[in-house]
C-alpha cells in the first residue's frame, strides 16, 4: 500500500487531496495545525474522517523535530505540503507568522526528507501570488516573479528552496504554481466564498448587503477538486518539475459577483466608480453590493491568468469545470448550509 503525508489536511486542498489519495488506495497521514479551535468540517463534509486508512495528526510545521518525527513514523513514498498561512490579507498583519509557516516550514520538511529518506517524493504548493505585479500575460512556468504580499514572498521562498533541494540533493521536489482554485469547501475569508455565502444569505433574506474591496481585481479561478488531481499527477512522473495549474481565463471580482446573483435569479446592475460603486437590484432598487475601502490591501495584485499548456502536454491535466458552473455549485452549497442555520 502506498503511503502519503498531506500537511494542511483541514484546509480545502488538503481535504480534497486526502479524499483522492484514499480513493486511490493510499494510507494517508493527514496533518492539521495545533490550535485552540481545530475545525475538521471539510474532512467531515467529504465523509472521510472515519476512513480506516486516514490517520489524522496534530502537527507543527515550524518545529523541525516534529517534521522528523512525522516522516520517520509515516515512512511515506510521497509528501504533499499544503500547510500554510494561506490568506493574503492576514499576511500583512501577521508577516512573521506567515514567514515561519509558509516559508521556513517548507525547509523543515525538505530537511526531514533529506535526512531520513531522500527518495521520498515531495510536492510544494506554490501559488500565482508569486507573480504579483505581473511581468507577462498570461503567466507561465518561466514568467519572472514579483510578489506583492508577505504571503507571496513566503511562498516564493518555499518555491525556490524546493528547486534548490531538487538540484542540490537530487530530491524529487515538484512545485505546483496553482492559480486561484475554489470550491464549496473554500474558507469564508476568501473572496469567492465570501461572495457566495453572502449572496446566499441575501437570497434567504438573512443579510441585506455584500461589502467588498477592489472589484476590478482579475483572477484565474478554477475548481479545487480538479487541481488536487494535478498535484498527484506531478508526483507520478519520472522526473520532478514545476507546473502551472490554471484555466487560462480571467474574470474580475465584479464578474464573479454578477454570476453569484444570477445563480439565485436576482437582477443586478453596477453603478458608479471606485469606492462609490454600488450593485443595485434592478427590480427593487435595493443596494446589494457596496465597496468598502477597509477591504483594500496595501499592495494589490491586479491581474492573474495562467497558461496550463505544459501541464496539459506532460501530465494530461486540464480544467473541466467552468467558472459559471463552479459559482453555481458554491451558491447551492451555501444556500443549503444557511437554510440549516450554519455556515462554516
Curated annotation (Swiss-Prot):
Binding site for NADP(+): 8-13, 60-61, 82-86, 155, 181, 186
Active site: 127, 129, 151
Pathway noted in the entry: Bacterial outer membrane biogenesis; LPS O-antigen biosynthesis; Nucleotide-sugar biosynthesis; GDP-L-fucose biosynthesis via de novo pathway; GDP-L-fucose from GDP-alpha-D-mannose: step 1/2
EC number(s) stated in the UniProt entry for this protein: 4.2.1.47
GO terms of molecular function: GDP-mannose 4,6-dehydratase activity; NADP+ binding
Catalysed reactions, as listed in the record: GDP-alpha-D-mannose = GDP-4-dehydro-alpha-D-rhamnose + H2O
Cofactor: NADP(+)
Signal peptide (UniProt feature, chain positions): none
PANTHER family per the UniProt record, alphabetical: GDP-MANNOSE 4,6 DEHYDRATASE (PTHR43715:SF1), GDP-MANNOSE 4,6-DEHYDRATASE (PTHR43715)
The protein's name in its UniProt record: GDP-mannose 4,6-dehydratase
Annotated organism of origin: Aggregatibacter actinomycetemcomitans (Actinobacillus actinomycetemcomitans)
